[in-house]
Every structure is written in structure tokens, then in C-alpha cells.
């Protein structure tokens, strides 16, 4: 498996989006504070801290595990870097430094790699894979709530400043990029999996995730206008169901019990917004049930709004928002069907094997026990 120049450029673009997302979030939080909207400022800052703290915890845990596996002692400087929220930046530094040598210093077109070159490419792919997992964590823990908050503020006031529009656009870009980057890293890091080749499969997968996410987020925003307590109760209930589902599947991503517990909590949170295969098993039935419930929940929220329209909500917005919710949901389901019916790399497999145990394992990788697709 080779780490190409295209992969290196994707890593560079990834850190640009990461830094931009971080700067915009801080900018929005400070702007809310100066405008006297202290609750919105605190929420925006809390979402950002929640995502980055969880990412730092997993990053440091993986650093310790890798050092232990290599027979080295854990270094206190890594702990300090993660306490200062620099763990992801440290990983980007190592990944880009080694990735540059793998992509540009060696001839990637040479088929006869020496052992040193193979080890370098394997090392870089593993580092980039770790980053894609951390970015996926942080994006869904911070980006999804942040996007809901910004959409709520936009619809409540009927207008927004440039920073809020920037936050919405950057959040969408971050969610989109981390989702596709994760899918590419998933298949590149596991040699027994087929690669996601071509632009069409990636775009189709992106639209499937993005449209279903956007539809659900707008539905949640409408429910927040109806009743904040009901909306929060629904989200907490779905979070609890996701955690129970993770425990029922007995995920085994972390060697440490406490980190595995945190992982299942995070998985439950991600399942509020989108579906992922948390154990690498056949997901046709669970995915179908998930999106049937999603469709019913979305239609239920829209029905309540049509039956009991709110006077505090601008009626001029409701019709276009309702149309947007329905269209994005339908498009998301359509792209889901197209992706799994035409573009999924495993669709033409002769035998259906368990994603984890059905095929011979060529090498160990954290991604093997992480969220599938």
C-alpha cells in the first residue's frame, strides 16, 4: 500500500480545514460574547471544548499504546502537549513530515519497494488513519451541535452576520471532509478491504451523509422552536439508545476499560446524527431500521408544526424549510441506495463475510475495530 502525492495533498487540505474550523468557532464565540449573547457564546465554546477534549483523550491514549507496543516508556511531553490541546497538531506534524518523504522523496511509481520504503508508507498510512478517526470524533461531537446552534440562531433572528454564515459553511465543509476522508482512510488502512476508487463513489457517499444529516438537523431546529425541553429529551433519548446499542454489540475498540466506555458514549452521540456500522457486521437490517425511524421522526416533527404552527416562528420560513427537509431526506436516501447498490466496493464480493472476522487479517490496525460505514 502506497502513500501517494494525492494522499499528501488531502492531508494538507485536512489540516487547513481543521485550523479554519477552529478559528471560526472561536471567532463566533467571541462575537456572541461581545454582542451580549452570553448563552450562545457559552454553548459555542462548550461544543468546541467537548469535541477537542475527547479527541485529545483518545490521541494521548493511542500515543501511550503505540509507545508501549514499541517497548518505549510514555513521555511526559506528550501528556503536556495534549493538556495544551496540541495533540492533533502534533499528529499532523508527524504525519505531514513523514508523509512528505513517502510521497515525494521515494518514487511512488516503483513497484519493487524495498522493506524500508514499505515500512515508511505503512507508518504514514497508520498515522493518517489515526488522524481521520480523531477528526471524525471531533467533527461530530463539535460540528453537528455547532451547526444546529447556528441554524437555530439564523432562523430565530431572520438574519445573521458574516461570522455565523462562515460558521455554517465551515461546519458543513468540516463534516463533509472528515466523513469522506475517514471513508478513504478506512479502506486504505485495511489491506483486506477494497479501495474506494474514483470520484463518483466518494461524491455519492458524501451526498448521502450530508443530505441525511442536513435534513435531520433542520428537523431538530424546528423541534427546538416548538419546545426546547422536548427537543433535548429526544436527543438524550436517542443518545441513550446509541450507547445501549454500542454495549449490546460489545465493541472492542480500546484496550482500556475506561476508554472503551468513553468510546461507546461517543458512538452513541454520533448515532444521533448518522448511521455507522459499529462492529463491522452486516448492517442491512440495522441501517434499514435506523433510516425508517429517521423518516418517521422527521415526518412527525413536520406534522406537529403544520398542525400547531407557532406564532413566534416566521411563517415565511416554514414552507421553504419544510420543502428543504423533505427534499434533502429523499435525496439522502436516494444517494444511500445508489452508493450501496452501485458503488460500494464490496457489492460484487462472491461471498458475504463478516467485516472483521470473515477474511484473513494481514496486519493489526486500530481502524479494524473502529466505526465501519
From Swiss-Prot:
Q: Where is this site: Cleavage?
A: 357-358
Biological processes annotated in GO: apoptotic process
Q: Which GO terms describe its cellular component?
A: membrane; plasma membrane
InterPro entries from the xrefs?
XK-rel (IPR018629), XK-related_scramblase (IPR050895)
- Give the domain of life: Eukaryota
Query: Where would you find the membrane-spanning parts of this chain?
Result: 8-28, 38-58, 166-186, 203-223, 224-244, 256-276, 295-315, 318-338
Record membrane topology:
Multi-pass membrane protein
Which key words are in the record?
A: Apoptosis, Cell membrane, Membrane, Transmembrane, Transmembrane helix
**What does the record say about activity regulation?**
Activated upon caspase cleavage to generate the XK-related protein 9, processed form. Does not act prior the onset of apoptosis.
Q: Enumerate the subcellular locations listed in this protein's record, separating them with semicolons.
A: Cell membrane
Q: Would you identify the family this protein belongs to, as annotated?
A: Belongs to the XK family.
The name this protein carries in UniProt is XK-related protein 9
Which organism was this protein described from? Homo sapiens
Gene name per UniProt: XKR9
Amino acid at each position: 500500500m502506497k502513500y501517494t502525492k494525492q494522499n499528501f495533498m488531502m492531508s494538507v487540505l485536512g489540516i487547513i480545514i481543521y485550523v479554519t474550523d477552529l478559528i471560526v468557532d472561536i471567532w463566533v464565540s467571541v462575537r456572541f460574547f461581545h454582542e451580549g449573547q452570553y448563552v450562545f457564546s457559552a454553548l459555542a465554546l462548550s461544543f468546541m471544548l467537548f469535541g477537542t477534549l475527547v479527541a485529545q483523550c483518545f490521541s494521548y491514549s493511542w500515543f501511550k499504546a503505540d509507545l508501549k507496543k514499541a517497548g518505549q516508556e510514555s513521555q511526559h511531553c506528550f501528556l503536556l502537549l495534549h493538556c495544551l490541546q496540541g495533540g492533533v497538531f502534533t499528529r499532523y506534524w508527524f504525519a505531514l513530515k513523514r508523509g512528505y518523504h513517502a510521497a515525494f522523496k521515494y518514487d511512488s511509481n516503483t513497484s519493487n519497494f524495498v522493506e524500508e520504503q514499505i515500512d515508511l508508507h505503512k507508518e504514514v498510512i497508520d498515522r493518517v488513519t489515526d488522524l481521520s478517526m480523531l477528526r471524525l470524533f471531533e467533527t461530530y461531537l463539535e460540528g453537528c451541535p455547532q451547526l444546529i446552534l447556528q441554524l437555530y440562531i439564523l432562523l430565530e433572528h431572520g438574519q445573521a452576520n458574516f461570522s455565523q454564515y462562515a460558521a455554517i459553511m465551515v461546519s458543513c465543509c468540516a463534516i463533509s471532509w472528515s466523513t469522506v476522508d475517514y471513508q478513504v482512510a478506512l479502506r486504505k488502512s485495511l489491506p483486506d478491504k477494497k479501495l474506494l476508487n474514483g470520484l463518483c463513489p466518494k461524491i455519492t457517499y458524501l451526498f448521502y451523509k450530508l443530505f441525511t444529516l442536513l435534513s435531520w438537523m433542520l428537523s431538530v431546529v424546528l423541534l427546538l422552536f416548538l419546545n426546547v425541553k422536548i427537543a433535548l429529551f429526544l436527543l438524550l433519548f436517542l443518545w441513550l439508545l446509541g450507547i445501549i446499542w454500542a454495549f449490546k454489540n460489545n465493541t472492542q475498540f480500546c484496550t482500556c476499560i475506561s476508554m472503551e466506555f468513553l468510546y461507546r458514549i461517543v458512538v452513541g452521540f454520533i448515532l444521533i446524527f448518522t448511521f455507522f456500522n459499529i462492529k463491522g457486521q452486516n448492517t442491512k437490517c440495522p441501517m434499514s431500521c435506523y433510516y425508517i425511524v429517521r423518516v418517521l421522526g422527521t415526518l412527525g416533527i413536520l406534522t406537529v408544526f403544520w398542525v400547531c404552527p407557532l406564532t413566534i416562528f416566521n411563517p415565511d420560513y416554514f414552507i421553504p424549510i419544510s420543502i428543504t427537509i423533505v427534499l434533502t431526506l429523499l435525496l439522502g436516501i436516494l444517494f444511500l441506495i445508489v452508493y450501496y447498490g452501485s458503488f460500494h466496493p464490496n457489492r460484487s464480493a462472491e461471498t458475504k463475510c463478516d467485516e472483521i472476522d470473515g477474511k484473513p487479517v494481514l496486519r493489526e490496525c486500530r481502524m479494524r475495530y473502529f466505526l465501519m460505514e
